[in-house]
Amino acid sequence: MLVALETRKLRLRHPLVTAHGSTTHRKIIEITAAEDGFQGHGEAAPLPGFGLETFSESLTALQNWVKNPNRLPDAPAARSAAATAIENLEKARSSSAPTSGKIAV
């Protein structure tokens, strides 16, 4: 299985305002797991001040996972993203044709 990571910074339509402050952007990590022409996708988007890991910790955990994809990351957001990519890959493999890599959102 080959795994690719891509980081993005997305602009929110409206500022997200919490007791911790406000933000107009979210940083995300997109994951693509590929094997035999099939692809699965996952995403990690830890929000500062919420959750158990920072964006940097999640990215580091996923970068380590890319080196050893047989062991899921311990960091919760990274683990969920990796598990989602693997599950989507398994679902794609059980379908009749390889995926195009495009996702309807």
Tell where the protein language model's regions lie, with residue ranges.
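N-terminal capping/lid subdomain adjacent to the active-site entrance of alpha/beta enzymes
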Residues: 1-105
